[in-house]
Amino acid sequence: MRTMVSDMESAPIPGCGIAVMAKASTPGCTKTRLVPPLTLDEAAQCNTAFLRDVADNILAASAQAPIAGYMAFGPPASKPFFQETLPREIGLIDAWYPNFGDCLLSSIVQLLERGHGSAVVLNSDSPTLPTSLLVETADMLARPGERVVLGPAHDGGYYLLGVKSARRRLFEDIAWSTEHVARQTLDRAAELELPVHILPRWYDVDDLRALKMLQAELFEDQSFALDLRPNRPQHTRVLMQALIENSDLQDRLTFNAFRRAAE
């Protein structure tokens, strides 16, 4: 398995490395499950806003815990997009494989090889994820002993997985992109006899229902979880506000919600 870590070579190594699994914003290739109600161009714009907000969220968490942020990206030719889009404090990791499990494992291996005591892979489409959950993850992984930290998503997947050593088995026999991912990952951890710390459930913005939840959090002050303070994603908020004001997005959201309900 190839490994390559780029940028930040002279930076100090905080205890916990967090790598966001990221794709460059290409219309027709990025966030296509949001089309409709979004157009292909709007979906790509959302991807860019999400990436910027997730990066900012990691940087905010790094002020409260020893955390360093990265983007695990592919293909390699997309590197300039991330260099131009993200804060310079965010490192870049090449993690491009046909199998998503290999992408995750490679990212973890590279973080640990860089010298981090723990490694976390994080999704790129939860811009309102509470910063406190990233801090909690780093704190749990800083404790003695092996463990897994898992952040389950509302759709049966997970938004975050943290470990202290690379265990290939955690990524084997997983039905990726299904509602079984989190449960199967817990099964793999049980096979390895690894204790698991489970974070509160959160949501991925990858379909109409989740897009409506995001809108409610941004503009209606409705939190996905009442006992958690969501991150306030400025880039996403500005983009969504502009799309609502300058296009018929609000009508499209309503129309598609009614259409899905009738199906």
Where are these regions (language model features)?
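Short beta-strand-to-loop acidic/aromatic patch adjacent to the donor-nucleotide binding site
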Residues: 117-125
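Short beta-strand/loop segment that forms part of the nucleotide-sugar
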Residues: 67-75
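N-terminal nucleotide-binding beta1-loop-alpha1 segment
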Residues: 1-34
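Short, glycine-/small-residue-rich phosphate/pyrophosphate-handling segment
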Residues: 168-186
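Short phosphate-binding loop-to-helix
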Residues: 81-118
